[in-house]
Structures are given as structure tokens and as C-alpha cells.
């Protein structure tokens, strides 16, 4: 039986952060919305991405904290017992709660329907939907939003199709702790998963083509590599996975690095080399929507495709694949599609965080990017040995690097390796957005014994030797 859904102002494919932000904004405008979702409502972040991974990272950090407690005089380190299935069950419960509170319940509260099925564009444009419970449906709307996100992708590796490898998605579904986990990829997924499983008790080997966190400053890459090695993670830089095959209940991998080939046996292999936009099967060619090399939907600055009635938001576009970008995109599309607002977004001061411990965070361009762009600049790097909060924590691993425009002193970028780096970088984001100079940043109030004080101290290094200043001296 054919179901017909017609007369909507906005039809959305997908149900993640971008989709929900658009739907909420549209409903707040009094517009009608219908959403089509082929899988679990909520998208990547709440189901298999941000929420479950950070929940497990927090648990791993708590366990590691007990193991590392001997850095404080008078405290003896312990090794807490681990019930991995119980940990995963708790994670699943949390995910279910947040999925209900922040997604499915909101759809009911705001009043839009979620059609569960796989959507394909047809002439009109309109959507043809193969319903999950059988049958078909059609959806017609004034405007359409593609918010289908992205999915893990794997490079061509000899034998990879013959082994049961993990991705960032399936790693969150493991019911038993891996004995030895080999991870390919040194981006945020590879780094977070490496430390997560190592701190829970797995033996971890990490292989990367260049350096860890290769999109960050070299000082941060070197710092996190040293920390990983100290925690017992085996790190192979400038290394490629050439071949892999089954080996009993595990895998045998051939790695090629600076010293030639070596073989590594592991119980599990995690591929964390990147993601690809989910656009296959959408029938975009039928409605004049172009895609790029990695399948991303090509959009203009207003997030409109070549078809004036079809828009795209989030990971499915060429823009940075952060959940907060997707959410901002969704609201923007609602404004532009339904109100003709022609709003755009400024990504200049877009912060990013990798939730290792200590964490990595940055905002603005790297020093190499500024040099390539011909922007005259000056830099200062502050070791956490000069930060009171790090000293009382008895953990001075990390740094803060600030980059300022030469001549004006305007803050251009901040790069942080520290506990709480995500919170520190938020303050730096505000400073860059406000156009502050490093001198103004140095003279801005910063509470003593907070990690954010590192920003003030780093700003002071442009004119002072902070090692020779008393506490809080400005």
C-alpha cells in the first residue's frame, strides 16, 4: 500500500543533529516538517559517536586516575577491577536515555512525524521511501534537506576485505575487551580509541602514515606521542598497513615503516582513517544535485544545492564534520529555505577538540598554514610547567601555543595540549572572535589556579618571561 505525505514546508532526510536543529527551527516558525530516517533516530553522535565514546573515555580516565594516583605523595596507586560488559551496558543505557530526551521525545513535543524508511529522490522533486516495515511512501515538500551525515571509510589494503575489522562505529559495540588492538589512523578517532582501550587494559599498537594528530602543531603531535608511549601504547609513525590476513582468531598485519617491513599479530584491527559522506542511493543525479570526490553534496555558502529547493547540512557537505557545525547548519537552512534569509556562517574561529587525556584543542590556523597564506605572524609556546593549575595537579604534561599577527598583536590562533583543553580553547575562541590582541588577552581577568589562566600566561610571554613573575602578576 502506498502512503502519501504531501504539503509539507520542509522534508528532511536523516535524524541527527543537523536534521533536528532544522526541524526545531522550522517548527518554531510555525512550518510543517516531516523527517525520513532509515536507521536509529539520533544520527551518529548520540548513538555511535560522541556520546558513547566520551562516556567510555571518562570511565577509562577514572580507572587510569586510580592507577596514576601515586604522583601525589601519600597516595598509593591501585588498579580497579573492570567488568567490561557492565561498562558497555551502562554506556548503552546512557545512550538510550539521551536518544529519547534529545531526539525522539522532542519530535513528539514539537510535532513532526518521523517516517522510518530509505528515501530516494525522484522527479519533482519528491521522495520515494521504502518503508522499513514494508510498503512504500511518497513525500512532497516545498523544500528538502539532506542531512544524512557520514560513515567510516577504509583505504584499499591487501586482504582487508577478508578480515572482520572494526570501525569507530563497531568499536562502540564490542562486548569483550580486545586483548591486543591494532589501530590504523592517527586522527581524533584513532587517538581517542587508542587511549580508551589502553587504559581499560588492552594492549594497543597505533600505526599512522605521518605523525600523530597530523593536522595539529608539531609540538602537540610530539607531546601526545610521548604521553602515549609513557602509557604503554606502541606507536609507529611514518608507517603504512600494507597487508592483513586472518591468523587464528586474530589478524596478522604487515606494516611498512622507516625500518622496512614488520609483522604485527593482534586480536582486533580498528580502521580509523576517515569518513565519507552518505549519499549513495539518494538519487541525487535525478534532481540535479552534484556531489564531490568523497560523495559530499556540493552546496553554496547558503547551504543550497544546484537545485534551489534542495539543501544540505552537516557531515554530508564539505564543511568540518563536527556535530556543532551540523546543528548550526540545520538552523541556517531553516532560515534560508523558509525565510529567504541568505545567512552564512563564519568558520574562522571554529574550535576543535580531541578528547585524549590530556586533551588536544585548537582554534584558528596552524603556523604552517599562516606561513603558506603569507600572513606575517609571531608565536609563543608556554610549557605547562609554568601553569600553577598544572603544578598543583602534579601533571605538567602539555603546552599552550599562541599565534599573533605581527605588527598588530591580534590573536590569530591558539593550540593547546592540556587537561581541560576544550574549556581553555573556548575562551581563546571568544578572544579571537572579539578581535583581541595578545596584550588585551594578557590584561583580561583570568581566575588563579584554573587551566584557563594558561591563556593569560601564554599571552604574557609575548612581552615577559613568566618564569620570573610572581603568582598572578600582570
UniProtKB/Swiss-Prot annotation:
Requisite cofactors: FAD
First-level EC class: oxidoreductase
Gene3D superfamilies membership: 3.30.390.30, FAD/NAD(P)-binding domain
Pfam families given in the database record: Pyr_redox_2, Pyr_redox_dim
Keyword Oxidoreductase attached: yes
Disulfide bonds: 45-50
Cofactor binding mode and count: Binds 1 FAD per subunit.
Domain of life (superkingdom): Bacteria
GO aspect biological process, one term: detoxification of mercury ion
InterPro entries linked: FAD/NAD-bd_sf (IPR036188), FAD/NAD-binding_dom (IPR023753), FAD/NAD-linked_Rdtase_dimer_sf (IPR016156), Mercury_reductase_MerA (IPR021179), Pyr_nuc-diS_OxRdtase (IPR001100), Pyr_nucl-diS_OxRdtase_dimer (IPR004099), Pyr_OxRdtase_I_AS (IPR012999)
Gene induction: By mercuric ions. Negatively regulated by MerR.
MF GO annotations: flavin adenine dinucleotide binding; mercury (II) reductase (NADP+) activity; mercury ion binding; NAD(P)H dehydrogenase (quinone) activity; NADP binding; oxidoreductase activity, acting on a sulfur group of donors, NAD(P) as acceptor
The protein's assembly and partners: Homodimer.
Function: Resistance to Hg(2+) in bacteria appears to be governed by a specialized system which includes mercuric reductase. MerA protein is responsible for volatilizing mercury as Hg(0).
Note: The active site is a redox-active disulfide bond.
Family: Belongs to the class-I pyridine nucleotide-disulfide oxidoreductase family.
Protein name: Mercuric reductase
Amino acid at each position: 500500500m502506498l502512503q502519501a505525505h504531501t504539503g509539507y514546508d520542509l522534508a528532511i532526510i536523516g535524524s541527527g543533529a543537523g536534521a533536528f536543529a532544522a526541524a526545531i527551527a522550522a517548527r518554531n516558525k510555525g512550518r510543517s516538517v516531516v523527517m525520513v530516517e532509515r536507521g536509529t533516530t539520533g544520527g551518529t553522535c548520540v548513538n555511535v559517536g560522541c556520546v558513547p565514546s566520551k562516556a567510555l573515555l571518562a570511565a577509562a580516565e577514572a580507572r587510569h586516575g586510580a592507577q596514576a594516583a601515586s604522583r601525589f605523595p601519600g597516595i598509593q596507586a591501585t588498579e580497579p577491577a573492570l567488568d567490561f560488559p557492565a561498562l558497555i551496558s551502562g554506556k548503552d543505557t546512557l545512550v538510550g536515555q539521551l536518544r529519547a530526551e534529545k531526539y525522539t521525545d522532542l519530535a513528539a513535543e514539537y510535532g513532526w512525524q518521523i517516517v522510518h524508511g530509505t528515501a530516494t529522490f525522484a522527479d519533482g522533486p519528491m521522495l520515494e521511501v521504502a518503508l522499513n516495515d514494508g510498503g512504500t511512501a511518497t513525500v512532497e515538500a516545498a523544500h528538502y534537506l539532506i542531512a544524512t551525515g557520514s560513515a567510516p571509510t577504509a583505504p584499499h589494503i591487501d586482504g582487508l576485505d577478508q578480515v572482520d575489522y572494526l570501525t569507530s562505529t563497531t568499536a562502540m559495540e564490542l562486548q569483550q575487551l580486545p586483548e591486543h588492538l591494532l589501530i590504523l589512523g592517527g586522527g581524533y578517532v584513532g587517538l581517542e580509541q587508542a587511549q580508551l582501550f589502553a587504559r581499560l587494559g588492552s594492549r594497543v599498537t597505533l600505526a599512522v602514515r605521518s605523525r600523530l594528530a597530523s593536522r595539529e602543531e608539531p609540538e602537540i603531535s610530539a607531546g601526545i606521542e610521548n604521553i602515549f608511549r609513557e602509557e604503554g601504547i606502541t606507536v609507529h609513525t611514518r608507517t603504512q598497513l600494507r597487508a592483513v590476513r586472518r591468523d587464528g582468531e586474530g589478524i596478522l598485519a604487515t606494516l611498512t615503516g622507516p625500518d622496512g617491513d614488520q609483522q604485527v599479530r593482534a586480536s582486533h584491527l580498528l580502521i580509523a582513517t576517515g569518513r565519507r559522506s552518505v549519499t549513495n542511493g539518494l538519487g541525487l543525479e535525478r534532481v540535479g544535485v552534484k556531489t564531490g570526490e568523497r560523495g559530499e553534496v556540493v552546496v553554496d555558502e547558503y547551504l543550497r544545492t544546484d537545485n534551489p529547493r534542495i539543501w544540505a547540512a552537516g557531515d554530508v557537505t564539505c564543511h568540518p564534520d563536527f556535530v556543532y557545525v551540523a546543528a548550526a547548519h540545520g538552523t541556517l537552512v531553516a532560515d534560508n529555505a523558509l525565510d529567504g534569509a541568505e545567512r552564512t556562517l563564519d568558520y574562522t574561529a571554529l574550535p576543535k577538540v580531541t578528547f585524549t587525556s590530556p586533551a588536544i584543542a585548537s582554534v584558528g590556523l596552524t603556523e604552517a598554514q599562516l606561513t603558506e597564506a603569507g600572513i606575517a605572524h609571531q608565536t609563543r609556546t608556554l610549557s605547562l610547567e609554568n601553569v600553577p593549575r598544572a603544578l598543583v595537579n602534579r601533571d605538567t604534561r602539555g603546552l599552550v601555543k599562541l599565534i599573533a599577527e605581527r605588527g598588530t598583536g591580534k590573536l590569530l590562533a591558539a593550540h593547546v595540549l592540556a587537561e581541560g583543553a576544550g574549556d581553555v580553547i573556548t575562551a581563546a575562541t571568544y578572544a579571537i572572535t572579539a578581535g583581541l590582541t595578545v596584550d588585551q588577552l594578557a590584561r583580561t581577568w583570568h581566575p588563579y589556579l584554573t587551566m584557563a589562566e594558561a591563556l593569560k600566561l601564554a599571552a604574557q610571554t609575548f612581552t615577559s618571561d613568566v618564569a620570573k613573575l610572581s603568582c598572578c602578576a600582570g
